[in-house]
Swiss-Prot record:
Gene Ontology CC, one term: cytoplasm
Primary gene name: mlaB
Pfam families: STAS
Entry's localization field: Cytoplasm
Name assigned to this protein: Intermembrane phospholipid transport system binding protein MlaB
Domain STAS, first and last residues per copy: 4-105
Length: 105
């Protein structure tokens, strides 16, 4: 199961992911991406992705997260990954994206 929440504070928006970001849980979040990736929602300078409660991420979840990060960059936001799980870093290394992901940590 995957849940998400959004919190706005001063100049920062924090997106919290809870549970499992995987092929089997990704579809509902992917369908709702317009809600949390729209320019009107991301009206702050800094966008943080808090992954402290992310229990599992697979390659499909990693690909989706990379797409979400790229979309935030397109909106000229400062993007940060907070508490990235070891699985995410392992997947980044596996796909040759360690340096790219490191820009967000």
């Amino acid at each position: 199961m995957l849940n998400w929440d959004l919190q706005k504070n001063n100049d920062k928006i924090t997106l919290f992911l809870f549970g499992e970001l995987s092929r089997s849980t990704l579809l509902p979040m992917w369908q709702q991406r317009g809600v949390f990736l729209s320019a009107s929602t991301l009206d702050k300078t800094i966008v943080e992705w808090n992954l402290s409660d992310l229990q599992h991420i697979d390659s499909a979840g990693f690909a989706a997260l990379c797409d979400f990060l790229r979309e935030c960059q397109k909106l000229n936001k400062t993007v940060r990954l907070v508490y990235p799980p070891k699985q995410l870093l392992t997947l980044a290394d596996l796909f040759g994206l360690s340096d790219w992901i490191a820009n967000f940590i």
